[in-house]
Swiss-Prot record:
PANTHER family: CYTOCHROME B. It is a multi-pass membrane protein. This is Cytochrome b. The chain crosses the membrane at residues 34-54, 78-99, 114-134, 179-199, 227-247, 289-309, 321-341, 348-368. It comes from Cyrtonyx montezumae. GO terms for molecular function: metal ion binding; ubiquinol-cytochrome-c reductase activity. Heme b b566 binds at residues 98, 197. SUPFAM superfamilies: a domain/subunit of cytochrome bc1 complex (Ubiquinol-cytochrome c reductase) (SSF81648), Transmembrane di-heme cytochromes (SSF81342). The gene is MT-CYB.
Length: 380
């Protein structure tokens, strides 16, 4: 009998073992769809980004008008731009839900997979930040100025660091050029780290909603989960296309319709919605270095989560107290996101400070305490 090329060819064999004959737990829910959705987001962003880059000029005098030209004169340029801008939002929605799933179901106990995932989040945030600067609108320029300025809070080398990042004494042409170079490079780095992420995942196999070994009950990935992933894909593409076609500027800032002007500052400088929670934490500390450290900690804290797991059970499926804390944390993040979009005045300042405090308290103190308490209550 002739060998099956899918199982014998050196390259096809890898694809087969990763996407077709992959043994998968039989009970993973829709919360496990987001990994494949993130892969689709990345592919979409790279393709639309490449098409945009073909018409973009990374120069302060031409950047804004080159984006306008893409939207007005390039065949379907408006659609490509709208898909790229809103695709970023969906990328973040998917990654936040993916991380939330990981926390709820204890997937972080696969430490290598989790740590590469957090690195992916950080790289994605860097990519989105440098990408937001490229249209060279008012919010692009001032967002870049405010966020890069945070590096000046680093003791002793801060100012040098900022001027090195800027390529001058302010955000100007060299900054835009290097941000474009970085924005082009980073998605490919993300793709590379994604392969490492998957390699680590396939060492252990997927977790499942019960958090117990599923070795006794595995099914092939294809056709079961490939079909389920296509359903998830349809459910994501529908709102993405709806947003991109009907209200493409809903999540953007109106300030970005004004070309960048270093002489006039917008009344409220704020990042895109997916960074607002971190921005609120940054602003809640009335000290530059303290704020920067809190901002960094708000994401880097994810690296600590595996070390803070004190429960004898892996998932939160049968742990109602931890579930309550989890959803309080989720609500807390929504509050931080809202506060990040508000001006710095009463009562938003105090709400932001309380929400920031409870964010760190929940993750660092309450989760381990409640995990230990549940062990005692269940006599584990």
């Amino acid at each position: 009998m002739a060998p099956n090329i899918r199982k014998s060819h050196p390259l096809m064999k890898i694809i087969n073992n990763s996407l077709i004959d992959l043994p998968t737990p039989s009970n993973i829910s829709a919360w496990w769809n987001f990994g494949s959705l993130l892969a689709v987001c990345l592919a979409t962003q790279i393709i639309t980004g490449l098409l945009l880059a073909a018409h973009y000029t990374a120069d302060t005098t031409l950047a804004f008008s080159s984006v306008a030209h893409t939207c007005r004169n390039v065949q379907y340029g408006w659609l490509i731009r709208n898909l790229h801008a809103n695709g970023a939002s969906f990328f973040f929605i998917c990654i936040y839900l993916h991380i939330g799933r990981g926390i709820y179901y204890g997937s972080y106990l696969y430490k290598e997979t989790w740590n590469t995932g957090v690195i992916l989040l950080l790289t994605l945030m860097a990519t989105a930040f440098v990408g937001y600067v490229l249209p060279w609108g008012q919010m692009s320029f001032w967002g870049a100025t405010v966020i890069t300025n945070l590096f000046s809070a680093v003791p002793y080398i801060g100012q040098t660091l900022v001027e090195w990042a800027w390529g001058g004494f302010s955000v100007d042409n060299p900054t835009l050029t290097r941000f474009f170079a970085l924005h082009f490079l980073l998605p490919f780095i993300i793709a590379g780290i994604t392969i490492i992420h998957l390699a680590f995942l396939h060492e252990s196999g997927s977790n499942n909603p019960l958090g117990i070994s599923s070795n006794s009950d595995k099914i092939p990935f294809h056709p079961y989960y490939s079909l389920k992933d296509i359903l998830g894909l349809a459910l994501m593409i529908t709102p993405l296309l709806t947003l991109a076609l009907f209200s493409p500027n809903l999540l953007g800032d109106p300030e970005n319709f004004t070309p960048a002007n270093p002489l006039t500052t917008p009344p409220h400088i704020k990042p895109e919605w997916y960074f607002l929670f971190a921005y609120a934490i940054l602003r809640s500390i009335p000290n530059k270095l303290g704020g920067v450290l809190a901002l960094a900690a708000s994401v880097f804290i994810l690296f600590l989560i595996p070390l803070l797991h004190k429960s004898k059970q892996r998932t939160m499926t049968f742990r109602p107290l931890s579930q309550l804390l989890f959803w309080l944390l989720a609500a807390n993040l929504f509050i931080l996101t809202w506060i990040g979009s508000q001006p710095v005045e009463h009562p938003f300042i105090i709400i932001g400070q309380l929400a920031s405090l409870s964010y760190f308290t929940t993750l660092l103190i309450l989760f381990p305490i409640v995990g230990t308490l549940e062990n005692k209550m269940l006599k584990l």
